[in-house]
Amino acid sequence: MLKVGLTGGIGSGKSSVARRLAAHGALVIDADAIAREVVEPGTPALAEIVAEFGDQVLTPEGRLDRARLGEIVFADETKLARLNAIVHPRVGERTQELMAQAKEGTIVVYDVPLLVENNLADQYDVVIVVDVPVHTQVERVTANRGMPEEQVRARINAQASREQRRAVADIIIDNSGTEEELDARVAEVWEELQRRLHSR
């Protein structure tokens, strides 16, 4: 098995890369999806979040209001650290369960936004960083998610910098071009991952 950590800032197109790698045959484990799963209604993590941040972070249906929580934590590093301390250990446990199900000879891609922030690079055989300039991140997120520019910039500033991400990368995918260019680059990266898997 080859364990690959895939990361990139908000709006970098990391999920597009993950989808393409899955199409090539990778088992993709999505940290964001797992993070949503571990805070479903009735979970211990959601109860802890409400105890920490109050009922204001719940929707009328009793689900986590991610937008409201985001407004609170992305403006305050201490609160963000507290949220991460609740959610990340549970995401880690669930991830280990999923990885344990992978067959021998599988390329497992762990799609994790906060790989650099949580010092996780050493857990992977290969780290892939999806890289775009900050202005591209801002343009994409304001256009695709309808988020105000100042909110997007606050999220970017709460994440690792481009330089910090690039410093831990074994492979960098520049995603500032076209969809076709991304297809071609991901195909090259898949070949490289196959080589690394078979040379182990």
Curated annotation (Swiss-Prot):
Catalyzes the phosphorylation of the 3'-hydroxyl group of dephosphocoenzyme A to form coenzyme A. It catalyses: 3'-dephospho-CoA + ATP = ADP + CoA + H(+). One of its GO terms (biological process) is coenzyme A biosynthetic process. This is Dephospho-CoA kinase. Keywords: ATP-binding, Coenzyme A biosynthesis, Cytoplasm, Kinase, Nucleotide-binding, Transferase. HAMAP family: Dephospho_CoA_kinase. Its EC number is 2.7.1.24. Pathway: Cofactor biosynthesis; coenzyme A biosynthesis; CoA from (R)-pantothenate: step 5/5. Belongs to the CoaE family. One of its GO terms (cellular component) is cytoplasm. The lineage of its organism: Bacteria, Bacillati, Actinomycetota, Actinomycetes, Streptosporangiales. It comes from Thermobifida fusca (strain YX).
